[in-house]
């Protein structure tokens, strides 16, 4: 596995929050080396403290010793009071700042200080509580405006999807979509809930309600891995459809196919079936509080349960049947259990005509008797024999 680093940082906009008091946070889309994209929220005061620490770590590059050596960009200090106008006008500065940082040598652009600052925190995953009196106000950067998301840090282009059916949000953290609505997907969570934006709205939408505009097949779905990855169930689930599997909490299983809609194909012995990825945890890892908050939303609906789905594509997305999964899984397990074939030094190889054989050694002739020597050998040999006797 290669080193962890950040490919791109894009500023999506900012939020005006009212808990515990009124303040503003900036919303960043961070693309990591494994092409995963995460949304994080940071206050400007946090960003400025990060900037000061970065200058202390690299005083030469910060121009603290010689001004002409400065390569770390300048960042103005926060004001005593930051209003909405200041938060909005500062977006251009932040865009240029992080764009410059990502273009610096790797000892700066990939330093642990930068990576740790943009790692997902529990607060980044903690969605607003439906019981809050006043919800956060979100101000997204216009796609055709000055701070185009695609121009912030290189080739970050939000993928566009279309809703195949009406979906009514179940909480304030989700987003309602109608059939035919076009949304930009900001984050694809393994849980099957995707964070989307549509004009000035944003929220979580089940991936099963969305289809790519270009083709009916989800190209990002990986191929099945019949070797399996060990996972443990952290929540019981009773199968509803025939191709699903029922499991209790704490059962050890193997994941053989991870699908983006949040319904993974798992294997328990020789049995395979769909199971919600939200109720799974990698074996040997502890579940975090942030993951508990995501899983509390519940498993997303499956595509097969959506009524009146209207796709713009003539052919539907291809999905393997459970019979195919089961057959391929059994074949793989049989091959894994089968003993290895004997090597070239095995006893069977001596019957193989293609195997090279060693040349036989000549037999040692018996020693001739004394009478034979006296009758057939030379006079010299006879004298030696006579003297020896």
UniProtKB/Swiss-Prot annotation:
Highest taxon listed in the record's lineage: Eukaryota
Membrane-topology descriptor: Peripheral membrane protein
Post-translational modification: Phosphorylated by PRKCD; phosphorylation induces activation of NCF1, leading to assembly and activation of the NADPH oxidase complex.
UniProt cross-references to InterPro entries, sorted A to Z: NADPH_Oxidase/PX-Domain, NCF1_C, NCF1_PBR/AIR, NCF1_SH3_1, NCF1_SH3_2, P47PHOX, PX_dom, PX_dom_sf
Localisation per UniProt entry: Cytoplasm, Cytosol; Membrane
Keywords: Cytoplasm, Membrane, Phosphoprotein, Repeat, SH3 domain
Annotated positions of the Phosphoserine modification: 304, 321, 329, 346, 349
Gene Ontology molecular-function annotations: phosphatidylinositol binding; phosphatidylinositol-3,4-bisphosphate binding; SH3 domain binding; superoxide-generating NAD(P)H oxidase activity; superoxide-generating NADPH oxidase activator activity
Entry text on domains: The PX domain mediates interaction with phosphatidylinositol 3,4-bisphosphate and other anionic phospholipids. In the autoinhibited, unphosphorylated state an intramolecular interaction with the C-terminal SH3 domain precludes phospholipid binding and interaction with CYBA. Phosphorylation disrupts the autoinhibited state.
Quaternary context: Component of the phagocyte NADPH oxidase complex composed of an obligatory core heterodimer formed by the membrane proteins CYBA and CYBB and at least the three cytosolic regulatory subunits NCF1/p47-phox, NCF2/p67-phox, and the small GTPase RAC1 or RAC2. Part of a cytosolic complex composed at least by NCF1, NCF2 and NCF4. Interacts (via C-terminus) with NCF2 (via the C-terminal SH3 domain). Interacts with NCF4. Interacts with CYBB. Interacts (via the second SH3 domain) with CYBA; interaction is phosphorylation-dependent. Interacts with NOXA1. Interacts with ADAM15. Interacts with TRAF4.
Protein name in the entry: Neutrophil cytosolic factor 1
Species name: Rattus norvegicus
Primary gene name: Ncf1
